[in-house]
Amino acid sequence: MPMQGAQRKLLGSLNSTPTATSNLGLAANRTGAPCLELPIPDGLFLSLGLVSLVENVLVVAAIAKNRNLHSSMYCFICCLALSDLLVSGSNMLEAGVLATRASVVQQLHNTIDVLTCSSMLCSLCFLGAIAVDRYISIFYALRYHSIMTLPRAQRAVAAIWVASVLSSTLFITYYDHAAVLLCLVVFFLAMLVLMAVLYVHMLAWACQHAQGIIRLHKRQPPAHKGFGLRGAATLTILLGIFFLCWGPFFLRLTLVVFCPQHLTCNCIFKNFKVFLTLIICNTIIDPLIYAFRSQELRRTLKEVLGRGRW
């Protein structure tokens, strides 16, 4: 089912080249202009999606099982895992629907697009929520439990899910407006800036705190420098993974708006599945960064799995 011209759906139809670039792509082939297209085997795509599903299901199951993990922080981590689960699951389902030519199955496309878009928005929102939660736990430590109560966290979670579903419905309905794509790009940049500012501030505070301890105990400065380097490396990895996994997808949305007829942009459009694969990779990495580092959660996972040592 070719999806050229006015893109029929916000996410599903982005797995194609706009009309203007369709003819230009043929011209590029005639002139011999190089165009790098990275093929992603369906088996690899589905395997990554399956790994993401298993990982995030384990996170949700562990948090649901252990009452000690029923806190605002783990509430956001659980919802991040759930949204990541939906991201990978909906993309796998999307791939299956696109591969099926039956008209009845194709009618599910709009529903799947809304699910995919809303789960992506939720995933970004919960990454930001986790950053805010950690920021409050550091800079308002004495009042943290009165500020970030579980009911407040649950209300924030409900608001994020409702806002994401409503926004996704509007985005899918008005998919052919450039403003829709720009809103998504601006939202991604806002989350990136929010996370960068909060984590950089937390790192700066941690370095100052470590320096104060060093002065108090009269230790050697190199220890502080080593701590700062480790913290900077951790921050670089955290934000770098976020940007590398999500950035190409939103770069493509930006190019769809600003250069739909450019040959170079046309080459980028052809790698849509690569960008989705990077997002799936992010849903695999998120549990490793935010969930599996918790000793309590790992202990609960051992009980859930009922075998071996975690």
Curated annotation (Swiss-Prot):
GO biological-process terms attached to the record: adenylate cyclase-activating G protein-coupled receptor signaling pathway
Residue numbers on the Extracellular membrane side: 1-37, 94-110, 176-183, 259-271
Chief location of this protein within or outside the cell: membrane
Membrane topology, from the record: Multi-pass membrane protein
Pfam families listed in its UniProt record: 7tm_1
Glycosylation sites: 29
Domain of life: Eukaryota
Chain segments annotated as transmembrane: 38-63, 73-93, 111-132, 156-175, 184-203, 233-258, 272-292
GO molecular function list: melanocyte-stimulating hormone receptor activity
Cytoplasmic side: 64-72, 133-155, 204-232, 293-310
Coiled coil: none
This protein's UniProt keywords: Cell membrane, G-protein coupled receptor, Glycoprotein, Membrane, Receptor, Transducer, Transmembrane, Transmembrane helix
GO cellular component, one term: plasma membrane
Cellular compartment(s): Cell membrane
Family under the similarity heading: Belongs to the G-protein coupled receptor 1 family.
Function: Receptor for MSH (alpha, beta and gamma) and ACTH. The activity of this receptor is mediated by G proteins which activate adenylate cyclase. Mediates melanogenesis, the production of eumelanin (black/brown) and phaeomelanin (red/yellow), via regulation of cAMP signaling in melanocytes.
Description of how the protein assembles with itself and partners: Interacts with MGRN1, but does not undergo MGRN1-mediated ubiquitination; this interaction competes with GNAS-binding and thus inhibits agonist-induced cAMP production. Interacts with OPN3; the interaction results in a decrease in MC1R-mediated cAMP signaling and ultimately a decrease in melanin production in melanocytes.
Name recorded for this polypeptide: Melanocyte-stimulating hormone receptor
Native source species: Leontopithecus chrysomelas (Golden-headed lion tamarin)
